[in-house]
Amino acid sequence: MQLEKMITEGSNTASAEIDRVSTLEMCRIINDEDKTVPLAVERVLPDIAAAIDVIHAQVSGGGRLIYLGAGTSGRLGILDASECPPTYGVKPGLVVGLIAGGEYAIQHAVEGAEDSREGGVNDLKNINLTAQDVVVGIAASGRTPYVIAGLEYARQLGCRTVGISCNPGSAVSTTAEFAITPIVGAEVVTGSSRMKAGTAQKLVLNMLSTGLMIKSGKVFGNLMVDVVATNEKLHVRQVNIVKNATGCNAEQAEAALIACERNCKTAIVMVLKNLDAAEAKKRLDQHGGFIRQVLDKE
């Protein structure tokens, strides 16, 4: 696909005079364009759901979720991956974000990194990619060689693959087994795909990881019951989670959390089933960590 023919490289008539308007009008133009992004994502919800089901199946079988991207796309993958351990209590290596150019590229532009097909393959080899893993290639343009080569290599290994881009019929979409293509149109600043395209990608990644965690029993109701208390805010959140899930008071919630080494799931089962920590943990283990199953089946 030629660069000049890509939707993400097109000219947006709504912002053609943006350098001549007031600051407030400038903000309104950007905001009006941003409003279209969730609607673009809504149109691809069936594709997102299909990807979540595949990711969950692979992760349940011992695989990992691997994000692969360059520039903004790579940074978004790293952002999503880095939030999973504290939010859902998963091991750091379960969701991995890879960016063209390596760690230095998180804060700096690395010339030519996104054009390196070898880089995409090598980065996957360096994390010992296996057929159990799912590789999600992220590229607003859908033409990034680093991502395309990574997806090709992943498919050769037998991995399930997902391609996220904002141009229909892109190489990323056709290379991956599953394509998620929210069409957000031309950017306010021509070609600045960190804007609407980046926002769309962030929304999609939010759904992929959150959907995976919900289906993995990391959420009870709408509570993040595997959250790790790494700071005072999260310490308080744990107490509130146990309170909200059980109807107990703060003192009871804190006592249960202390008794089970601050594991929200165990504390919730302790309170709801009137069990000690060891028995509550045992029942959770018997049901794969799903609170709902412990409550419904016993």
From Swiss-Prot:
CDD domains: SIS_Etherase. GO terms for molecular function: carbohydrate derivative binding; carbon-oxygen lyase activity; ether hydrolase activity. Residues 55-218 form the SIS domain. This is N-acetylmuramic acid 6-phosphate etherase. A lyase-type mechanism (elimination/hydration) is suggested for the cleavage of the lactyl ether bond of MurNAc 6-phosphate, with the formation of an alpha,beta-unsaturated aldehyde intermediate with (E)-stereochemistry, followed by the syn addition of water to give product. Pathway: Amino-sugar metabolism; 1,6-anhydro-N-acetylmuramate degradation; Amino-sugar metabolism; N-acetylmuramate degradation; Cell wall biogenesis; peptidoglycan recycling. Induction: Induced by MurNAc 6-phosphate that releases the repressor MurR from the DNA. Repressed by MurR in the absence of MurNAc 6-phosphate. PANTHER family: GLUCOKINASE REGULATORY PROTEIN. The keyword Lyase applies. It is an enzyme of class 4 (lyase). It comes from Escherichia coli O139:H28 (strain E24377A / ETEC). The active site is at E83, E114. Specifically catalyzes the cleavage of the D-lactyl ether substituent of MurNAc 6-phosphate, producing GlcNAc 6-phosphate and D-lactate. Together with AnmK, is also required for the utilization of anhydro-N-acetylmuramic acid (anhMurNAc) either imported from the medium or derived from its own cell wall murein, and thus plays a role in cell wall recycling. GO terms for biological process: 1,6-anhydro-N-acetyl-beta-muramic acid catabolic process; amino sugar catabolic process; N-acetylmuramic acid catabolic process; peptidoglycan turnover. Belongs to the GCKR-like family. MurNAc-6-P etherase subfamily. Its EC number is 4.2.1.126. Homodimer.
